[in-house]
Amino acid sequence: MADSEDGDHVATTTTEQRYDDDGHLVPSSGGQEEEGSGGRDVVVPGGHVAEDYRSGVGVPVGRDAGGATSSPPQPVHVTPSILVGSIHAPVFQGELVGMKFGVGSGSMGAGTSATRRLPATGFGALPTSSMAEDSADHADDDHLAEEEEEEEEEHYIDDGPLVPSSGGQEEEGSGGRHVFVPGGHDGEEDHPDDLVADLDLDLLVDGVVGPVPGGHLNADAPAFVPTTRGRQDLYSALSSSAPAAGYRYRHYITSSALAEAGHVSPFLGLPYATAFDSPLDRELVGPSSAPPPCSAASRAWLVRCSSPLSDSEWTRRSILAREAAHTPASTVTGRGRFEFVPIPGAPYAPPPSFAPIAAGAGPAARPLQQLAFGLEEHKTKLCAEYYSRGLGCPRGNTCKYAHGEDDLRLVVAVSSLADAGEGSSSSDSSFAALGGEDKYKTKLCKTFTSGGLCLFAANCRFAHGEVELGKKEPCWYFFSGQTCPRGDTCGFRHSY
């Protein structure tokens, strides 16, 4: 029926409403308003928002692009109902109640400010008692499957709901629908990263896995707390848990030994260091042959813990063990410090003195007498090889024969002087008796002063420079067969 009035007259057009066999309203042409049985004007396909004139509240409604449904609508067996988009919205007592519409990234309840994906059994259901009785028998499974296929992307925070987008604007869902989210924020979803790996300490120590920043460490044993018998208890625990050498602390690493920022690199801070006088033996501190850490971020190793106290204790025990293996037990004690047991009759002799040689002078005179008789023929004859080889002797300075007339010496047997009872209280008299001492180092060496290399070196009887002039006193180190620590700078004579 249609009433029209020109000017002051209002034209009212009433169209015929058509219902199907189940009592559902059949939509008319796209874009026009249809009056439902509840007295509400609802935008049918081609429209966007259904307004409730009584409450004045706009209800957000899902909308297919272009206003067309991808499949024939499947009726929900409730009478009456209104087809909105592709959802059948039942009407009770003249009002549209509790609709939930399927949208691109989930489902949205009417009047809410966030969307959440609903389980399949509750999709499109109405939170009313009358609807609950029929929802189990009249669920639209085909429609649910089609809606889920259209969903291509879902953004959730850690507990599932979609993060709202920018306030008041329309966001395009993956299912081809525009979603109006009141009070949301723009665009990017928050993804708090609480899904971090659980790290096992044994795997980290063995290098099987690498440390993950922020990872949760699975420590399957309590931290070690020093007690009165803590050292013995820890020693027993390690001995029973580690069958071979190279022990590793797998269950006695405290959380304080882990580095910051999630980089797990357990260094051994020994908790018992302050409770005892000395730590355990070094072989229990760490693997003796373990390689050094490759990288603090790639592999975590146990490292050797060393301190002055532990080093000294370990050294003391090592020396005691080695000494006990090679020395009688009476000479090594283990009372916490070393005790050096004096050996009876230890050889100790003072440097020999150049005392006068006399008959029956005793043991002190014998070395000097033997030295004097050994030097009886030293440098008293010319070296034949020295002249035959063109002034070159293979023995060099060690040759007992004189290499030239300047090298000749006059040696007088000491025994004859001793038998005669001659001598003086000074050491000069005994060596002066060897002959030629009045000329020793009193003149400069011609070879040395000419810039040549003297083959006699320190044994040359002539002075090599002004410093050696007047060196008449014999060097004790040289004549006793030892090396003089002063070398050529010695103020005493290094020559026979």
From Swiss-Prot:
A zinc finger (C3H1-type) spans 377-406, 439-467, 469-496. Residues 1-77, 108-194 are annotated as: Disordered. GO terms for molecular function: DNA binding; mRNA binding; zinc ion binding. Keywords: DNA-binding, Metal-binding, Repeat, Zinc, Zinc-finger. Residues 143-156 have a biased composition (Acidic residues). Coiled coil: none annotated. This is Putative zinc finger CCCH domain-containing protein 48. It comes from Oryza sativa subsp. japonica.
